[in-house]
Amino acid sequence: MFVASKQADEQKKLVIEQEVQKRQFQKIEELKADMQKGVNPFFKVLFDGGNRLFGFPETFIYSSIFILFVTIVLSVILFQAYEPVLIVAIVIVLVALGFKKDYRLYQRMERAMKFKKPFLFKGVKNKAFMSIFSMKPSKEMANDIHLNPNREDRLVSAANSYLANNYECFLDDGVILTNNYSLLGTIKLGGIDFLTTSKKDLIELHASIYSVFRNFVTPEFKFYFHTVKKKIVIDETNRDYGLIFSNDFMRAYNEKQKRESFYDISFYLTIEQDLLDTLNEPVMNKKHFADNNFEEFQRIIRAKLENFKDRIELIEELLSKYHPTRLKEYTKDGIIYSKQCEFYNFLVGMNEAPFICNRKDLYLKEKMHGGVKEVYFANKHGKILNDDLSEKYFSAIEISEYAPKSQSDLFDKINALDSEFIFMHAYSPKNSQVLKDKLAFTSRRIIISGGSKEQGMTLGCLSELVGNGDITLGSYGNSLVLFADSFEKMKQSVKECVSSLNAKGFLANAATFSMENYFFAKHCSFITLPFIFDVTSNNFADFIAMRAMSFDGKEDNNAWGNSVMTLKSEINSPFYLNFHMPTDFGSASAGHTLILGSTGSGKTVFMSMTLNAMGQFAYNFPANISKDKQKLTMVYMDKDYGAYGNIVAMGGEYVKIELGTDTGLNPFAWAACVQKTNATMEQKQTAISVVKELVKNLATKSDEKDENGNSISFSLADSNTLAAAVTNLITGDMNLDYPITQLINAFGKDHNDPNGLVARLAPFCKSTNGEFQWLFDNKATDRLDFSKTIIGVDGSSFLDNNDVSPFICFYLFARIQEAMDGRRFVLDIDEAWKYLGDPKVAYFVRDMLKTARKRNAIVRLATQSITDLLACPIADTIREQCPTKIFLRNDGGNLSDYQRLANVTEKEFEIITKGLDRKILYKQDGSPSVIASFNLRGIPKEYLKILSTDTVFVKEIDKIIQNHSIIDKYQALRQMYQQIKEY
């Protein structure tokens, strides 16, 4: 009976154990599946379960028993007084209740007291301040901030003479040896454009961060990651745009941008390697520098230095997609500066300054105080007084509880704050034996404290994941310090930060008792952190996910100089808009741009705005550019008068070609003018050839064409006769009024031939009252003047007329191509598909896209309908030759169309169709895409009306143009819009 019962119990235990193992296996598989998706659990059992005894921290239990015992001995036994015992007991109970509310209270109190009562913690506060505010030896400079309590600072003065001779053996470019005998190296990293990158790609990129910390499982390494958000001022108000309206509009825009809050977000990873773990003695002392020991000691240090550099290079390789840059020394005007020291100095009070690091002098030329004179601490805020007597306020944020799981987007809202901050994450990996001991210790404490089966299962899962090498564990702490120029701004920033963190599942508040700890902890420090707990390597990688913007354009030293203008990115950082590919000033760089946006998306406003901004390129040319080429010409091929007001306000010539009305175009007069200039022989011949081909096209208008577009019935003799007559007319010294009429008069013998040259040209001749006499048979002054800075041509009237559109477009684009002579040239073609529908225009544009770069010209093609542009004969050329693509909102777009023409990803297409409201998606070959705003709120409304002309105002603008008594057309336009009731 007893045996049967025992077997039944064992069988039951076996079933339970199998069920537990099954559940644990399922749990592990679920965790692994989540981790594959970038979702990593917090093992909160490590936060408090392993450090508590009967529900309280064991150090608190032992300390309370000791204090109570001493009180009883002193009060009751010696003095027969019971009140002190009661008071101590009440204090212990109150503290215990505090633990019930916040299990970290004891640790926070202990660490905070190091700053509040330094006499109880010898030297801690003084050392912490001294490390920042005193002069330190150059290459040991920063890590006193680090203050490990298990070490003594024994770089004694007795060794100074040896240091003076041999300290250089500890130095290397980008590596600092501290007086705590640790090596420090810092890498600056670029962000990932998380807004425009697909989730799958983000997970793959983030996996490289996971791999870094799985490769470091020894406690001799520590990592300090800083996210630094620094306010910057965008001041472009001193730029000259050359034209009155351009200057007025861009001044209003630039002043608005100057008032905006722009921030620069930077990421830094500092690696520390502890050398003491590799030496036989706990600290180095003078005998290391004795003659018989120094060479061996030097050899060990050099070996460790090489190993440290190898590890940093490994990290750079693993994080190569984040564009790592080592902070090293650099030379300017013969003086050596240290980027690395500048960064550590910056962490004090967010003051940027060059940092001299002269290798011939062991002591810094400037103090390691970051430009800070004094620091004051209050309850929830602090104030920094800088050397220049400027003030900055700060506050620390304490995170009490963490969300159940971590993901790479955990701190996205923090990065988007309208505030300056330094966010430091500290991580110290544990080795495998320490991990095993930690897990066993935690398991025992869970049993003692009556922990749940769920905690036990969680611990089992953790052990399995660690054992398989999926994750590692390490000690972690953080310090988030906000900065502001005013107290009110500081309070607002704290409110926004706390709200953002709480919305992500954290429990955060402004630090009070521990604020000093957090302030000093941001300098690569564990010892001053109020709370340190264990997290997985994946958790830490999620904390430091570099989600910002890796491509911000280029502010200056572009092909034509400065950036076109500055826009604001989604994370409030500046985006320097350029059309050219990144290059150096004066270099020939492709700048052709495709602009796509539906009706109402702001396409015309954007094009007009940037056209005004490009007025600045009429100045500042490279020295190798000849004087006659130091000029800028901008041509805008318009549709439906959208740019009419803008061209007029800029002081440009707006050519309206209307059916039946003399165009003012005289190709013969233009070609004859070229013959009289100092143009090259090739340019002169080209001008004649253009007119020959144009007149031949007129003569063969009604002919049946072959597959190459050549007339079947036009004889070679007629072609030669026509060409000779055109050449004679252009090169002869004669009046070129009505040149088509003069040609017909020259062909008098053909009047009776229905297929002769006279009959062919008669429709374009005034003397014969031809149907199209208004096209080119005009006075001897051609209307197109490309010596002007800005010219607009509207094709609304003729583009849909197949009888005349091919001839007008041919002449216009031939003239434009001729004007691309090495000067800076911008050609804008709005609703490009309408112009490119003509095969000859398509040929011209295709040639421009392929060769204009060498002639210092850029072409910008814009359209509302991507489908129509795909139907153009040069769609493939557009895709290949336009490295810059700018997208505005298009709710009705088709993914396959965008992919065919612009290589758009699914994520980018989602943004185009849903996420662009007065914003652009900028995509340039070889660079990540960027979302940037061209928000024009606050700009005078009359300026905005000028940028994009509504059709209802076309006649009013016509009146202004036709009224010759109005000299300043721009001011007339401005007054017209100001008088409208809407304003």
Curated annotation (Swiss-Prot):
Enzyme class: translocase
Binding partners and assembly: Component of the Cag type IV secretion system, which is composed of a wheel-shaped outer membrane complex (OMC) and an inner membrane complex (IMC). Interacts with CagV and CagBeta.
Classification via PANTHER family: TYPE IV SECRETION SYSTEM PROTEIN CAGE, UNCHARACTERIZED PROTEIN YJGR-RELATED
Protein's cellular compartments: Cell inner membrane
The keyword Membrane is assigned to this record: yes
Any one cellular-component term (Gene Ontology): plasma membrane
NCBIfam families on file: VirB4_CagE
Membrane topology value: Peripheral membrane protein
CDD domains to which the protein is assigned, alphabetical: TrwB_TraG_TraD_VirD4
GO MF: ATP binding; protein-exporting ATPase activity
UniProt xrefs under Pfam families: CagE_TrbE_VirB, P-loop_TraG
Name the record gives this protein: Type IV secretion system protein CagE
Known role: ATPase component of the type IV secretion system Cag (Cag-T4SS). Acts as a molecular motor to provide the energy that is required for the export of proteins. Required for CagA translocation and induction of IL-8 in host gastric epithelial cells. Plays a key role in Cag-T4SS pilus biogenesis, especially in the localization and stabilization of the pilus-associated components CagI, CagL and the surface protein CagH. Is also critical for assembly of the entire cytoplasmic portion of the Cag inner membrane complex (IMC).
Family (UniProt): Belongs to the TrbE/VirB4 family.
Keyword Membrane (UniProt): yes
SUPFAM superfamilies: Calcium ATPase, transmembrane domain M, P-loop containing nucleoside triphosphate hydrolases
EC number: 7.4.2.8
Binding positions (ATP): 597-604
Reactions mediated catalytically: ATP + H2O + cellular proteinSide 1 = ADP + phosphate + cellular proteinSide 2
Keyword tags: ATP-binding, Cell inner membrane, Cell membrane, Membrane, Nucleotide-binding, Translocase, Virulence
Gene that this polypeptide is encoded by: cagE
Primary residence: membrane
